[in-house]
């Protein structure tokens, strides 16, 4: 028709293809933008770990074990079940044993944490080795921390009391008797050290 610009079939197909391509690219981009989760809230916490003070920026959803392993590099604490049942992640929080997979990092703000790395020179570790307590070793750090809490709170614990205190720590290698023997050996070592300290202390003369 006169006065009207004719569009060739080739130009029509080229234009249609470009429009379809642009729409196809735009849809995933819009979907990605819509699906992007909002940034998780973060909190600054002050925490003392094995006697060293730390300031951490943590997401409010992080667990204590995540903060220890992924952000402080303390990988001695293990993640086992990750649901507060096996005890592999046990640490001491203000001296009390807790499952660090079930504790939010923000709950530790202003508090003191001890991990297995803090027991490097503890006689309890030597007793565990001497009595072949670790087998595969995965649960050992949690077993150590529960045993440490027991001997700190009750140095004269009986075997039955030790068994009860360790009940929250699962050992898939069934090395329970070895762990109890190691605890008894550590108790004996503590008593000997206490006796030696008393013997070497200068006597007071009135």
Give residue spans per PLM region.
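Signature of N-terminal electron-transfer/Fe-S-associated modules in redox systems
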Residues: 2-206
């Amino acid at each position: 028709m006169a006065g009207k610009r004719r569009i060739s079939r080739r130009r029509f197909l080229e234009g249609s293809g470009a429009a379809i391509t642009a729409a196809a690219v735009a849809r995933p981009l819009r979907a990605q933008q819509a699906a992007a989760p909002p940034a998780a809230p973060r909190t600054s916490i002050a925490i003392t770990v094995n006697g060293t003070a730390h300031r951490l920026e943590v997401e409010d959803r992080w667990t204590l074990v995540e903060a220890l392993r992924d952000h402080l590099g303390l990988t001695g604490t293990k993640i086992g079940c990750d649901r507060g049942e096996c005890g592999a992640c046990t640490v001491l929080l203000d001296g009390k044993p807790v499952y660090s997979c079930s504790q939010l990092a923000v709950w530790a703000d202003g508090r003191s944490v001890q991990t297995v790395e803090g027991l490097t020179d503890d006689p309890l570790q030597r007793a565990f080795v001497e009595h072949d307590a670790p087998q595969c070793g995965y649960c050992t750090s949690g077993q150590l921390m529960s045993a440490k809490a027991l001997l700190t709170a009750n140095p004269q614990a009986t075997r039955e009391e030790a068994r009860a205190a360790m009940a929250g720590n699962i050992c898939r290698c069934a090395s329970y008797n070895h762990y109890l023997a190691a605890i008894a050996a550590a108790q004996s070592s503590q008593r000997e050290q206490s006796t030696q300290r008393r013997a070497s202390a200068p006597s007071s003369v009135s």
